[in-house]
Amino acid sequence: MRYLLVLAMLASMAACQRTPEQQQADALRSDARQRAADTENQADFQADRLQQQASDLQNQAAQAGGMTGERLRIRAKALDQESKVIRKQGDMQADAAREDADARIKASKSR
């Protein structure tokens, strides 16, 4: 009975051990996830800053009124649109980093 228990433990330990290729794939995925998160965080930071500037310009536009207010509203709208583009670009770059890692892993498995 004890022999079967030891044998079962050894079999489960062997099943849990990762090959060097699997470890390398895990490291690639982890690195890609981290790069993607960094990219998204940087894009969010830049976009938040632009949205804050847009909000400030909207407030100034409301106070200024007239043509000056209209100019400020146009600038605010442009900054808001730019912030959306920056977020989208960050998301796309993050997706590309993850897809690149997946492609590298698949290529290494096919060798």
PLM feature segments, named:
Residues 25-34, 55:
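Juxtamembrane extracytosolic/periplasmic "stalk" immediately C-terminal to the first targeting helix
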